Amino acid sequence: MENRANTEGTFERELEFTALTRWFHWIRAIAIFVLIVTGFYIAYPFLTPIKNSEPTNFMYALARSWHQIFGFALIAVTIFRVYLFIFDKGCRVERASFWDLINPLTWFRQLRNYMLLGPHPHLKGVYNPVQLAAYMGLMVLILLISVTGIILYYNVYHDGLGAILFAIFKPLEVMFGGLANVRAIHHITTWAFVIFIPVHIYMATWNSARYPNGGIDSIFSGFRYHKKHY
């Protein structure tokens, strides 16, 4: 059991991310990385195994299989993560960030801080408004790439799970304007992830270097540290 605070020494330790939140973060990170690599290979097979007379070396089929496995893993983990964010008691401090998101003054102070023109604002939750807005944008991207990925899946696999998904998602395929548009949206959304990842890493590193009281460490340990006030 993780304690909420450790009052020994000159710092107090506060739990910022629960174990499930941290595990889901890294599962999604690995899944997104694998999906990007395999997705680009599926779109443009840049490696081809040496041809032989035996039914082996199906590299394209292997890439597609891994793409599907990690795609469904991303969907499952994201659904559970959204559930935790809304209902889990351990995520109360994350939900509190919503009040900073709708506060114009907090937005102003946070942007001023990013421009090195002012101190870091006091926040009610874990995320500052820019972080929470980016996190919500990421959820929209995951939703979009998941829906388009499911549509592409059932257009290849017509029986079993594919038949069930076809009955549910076919109206969305029509709404998107057909399979060609779905594939284009899926590909464009992939590039949105490619852009998001280095920006996310840079901002997380910048924030950790400027305010070394947890930062990136917290997504590993779960804790953030604050100086004690006597």
UniProtKB/Swiss-Prot annotation:
It comes from the Bacteria. Pfam families: Ni_hydr_CYTB. InterPro entries: Cyt_b561_bac/Ni-Hgenase, Di-haem_cyt_TM, Hydrogenase_cytochrome, Ni-dep_Hydgase_cyt-B. One of its GO terms (biological process) is respiratory electron transport chain. It is found in: Cell membrane. The keyword Oxidoreductase does not apply. Coiled coil: none annotated. GO terms for molecular function: electron transfer activity; heme binding; iron ion binding. The chain crosses the membrane at residues 23-43, 67-87, 134-153, 188-205. One of its GO terms (cellular component) is plasma membrane. Keywords: Cell membrane, Electron transport, Heme, Iron, Membrane, Metal-binding, Transmembrane, Transmembrane helix, Transport. B-type cytochrome that interacts with quinones and anchor the hydrogenase to the membrane. PANTHER family: NI/FE-HYDROGENASE 1 B-TYPE CYTOCHROME SUBUNIT, NI_FE-HYDROGENASE 1 B-TYPE CYTOCHROME SUBUNIT-RELATED. This is Quinone-reactive Ni/Fe-hydrogenase B-type cytochrome subunit. The gene is hydC.
